[in-house]
Each structure stands twice: as C-alpha cells, then as structure tokens.
C-alpha cells in the first residue's frame, strides 16, 4: 500500500511541475492533438469491429 502512495506522490509532483511551470500551455496543445488522434482511432476500431461482426 505504501508503494501505491509513493507512486501517486511522484505522479502528483510531476503534474505540479507541469501545471505550475511554463510547460502547461505546450502540454495542453499536445494533449488536444493526442485526444483527437485517439478519438479517431477509437471510432475506426469500432467501425472495423462492427463490420467484422
């Protein structure tokens, strides 16, 4: 259980560095691009699965 707490602490610290630093705007732009790419991939996978049955 302590290992989970330490893992989440590290994730929170990394998020704080990105959030409070100047990297936030660049990260947000990259996140938006990745969101749309994965959204398109999800829709394509759904269509292929529906076609194959």
From Swiss-Prot:
The chain crosses the membrane at residues 4-24, 29-48. One of its GO terms (cellular component) is plasma membrane. Coiled coil: none annotated. It comes from the Bacteria. It is found in: Cell membrane. It is a multi-pass membrane protein. Pfam families: DUF1328 (PF07043). Signal peptide: none annotated. Its main location: membrane. Keywords: Cell membrane, Membrane, Transmembrane, Transmembrane helix. The keyword Glycoprotein does not apply. Belongs to the UPF0391 family. NCBIfam families: PRK13682.1-1, PRK13682.1-3, PRK13682.1-4. This is UPF0391 membrane protein TM1040_2720. The lineage of its organism: Bacteria, Pseudomonadati, Pseudomonadota, Alphaproteobacteria, Rhodobacterales.
